Amino acid sequence: MGKIALYWNTIKYMKPSQIYYRMAKKIGLRCTIGCIPDTNYGDVALIKTPVDFDKDPVFLERFDADELLNNKVTFLHSSKEFLWNEKWAFEDQSALWNFNLHYFEYLFSMLSAYEKTGNRDYFDKTIFCIESWIKENPEGEGVGWSPYTIDLRLTNWISYYCMTEKELPTEFKVKLIESIHRQFVYLSNHIEKDILGNHYFEDLKTLVLCSLFFQDSTMLQASLKAFKAECKEEILSDGMHFELSPMYHKIIFEGLLRVIVALRGNGIKETELENLIQPMLDVAWSFEEGLERIPLFNDCGNNIAKSIASFVKICKKEFEITPHFKSNLEDSGFYIYKWDNWKMIVDAGQVGPSYIPGHAHCDAMSFELFKDGKPVITNCGTYGYQCEERQFFRSTMSHNTVMVDGVEQSQCWGAFRVAKRCSVRVLSRNENAILMELIDQKKNILNREIKIEPSKIIITDTCKNKVLKTSLHIVSNEVNINSAMKPVIEVQQYAPEYGIISNITVYYWLQKNKIETTVYLGE
């Protein structure tokens, strides 16, 4: 019965369309947006791309051009020797690592090295890598033909083509364009309507870019209509992406900017989409302004999305838009406090969209604290998806929050599943305090108040006749912790970036009815 209940409490939140398309895919039916690309295509168009994303120094540093030249690839802090003209899959690496192999983001590191040094070997290597992929990845076989990997690869290949078209050998250009079109057609028949969320967004974004690239007006009309509708669905009124991850917010924002820049370059101005730029930039800026890394709420890591500087640069250059700080993100439930050289971000949001909470953590009422941009009190991060550590990093204990009677806030299971969920609401808030109420998966009701005073933060957790467990994860000696009872101090796993784990000190308290903790701030 337990397993039946688990599945029921997961499935009941899904849209009927998701269940239908999941079953349709199982029996091999197509999943389209009601339109597929023209099989006959002529000349391609050099679409305008926001090259500052592909030339973002922080992004380029993730890939070593010399390693790539010498047949070594590194993703998510894990390296492999790879000859390219062999099977594009490593069973000893994670699914996410293998996905990254197929994204082709590393092309731009080699292009940058070529631009800086004039060494043609880097440029020729990009051609060899693409040719090898085309040869070694037959249509529909392996993770390289997963719709999400197609999305990112085609986005990168189109940018690559538009940046290098004049230098590419004619024979290779023909081969590259042919492969892009084949993948475009395949993607259009395998849209992720069963998953939705950021996956569906990326599918639609890629269809729009490919439609512009192949000058397919019928496909452009259909894909752009669907893309606009999905933006309306996924972008909240405060500008935050509805999956409530600062990292995925930037990934989605990048996709939106790529579409708008490409449309503008084609003489198409979509005001409805362009009106999203300012609020989405404000959200990204408000999270990261003055910080050395992205805040760790829900699935998040510092080595995936592009840098905040690249977003600011592109928005200014392309649209004359500059960011504004917002302390209240009421629709998404994030509240940001700044004073002196301190910054605190509080999460009072829901689990995420009810039908796709796959990137959710048990981090309700948690917070992160920074001093001079450096993390002081932090959540534990994400590390990976299909790994044994997944459950820990999604758990309540890996966040600076509270649980009752040992009950997880929400019932996270598998890599991307949530069954019973908590709910959160803000009872009151002002410029130096917030009072929140959480109802966990077992219907326990608990309150948390966070008060900021000149030299301290007071955290008060209450739940009548229940045993509370409050956790704080400390990465700096910039604070001192005090409570009426002595804390238990342990070492836990910490992953501010995907693919690498270090240690963090966790303080936790167990007490009935009420726990009050004071964080004294250093000078």
Residue ranges and their predicted role:
Residues 80, 342-344, 376, 409, ...:
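Short, isolated positions in well-ordered beta-strands
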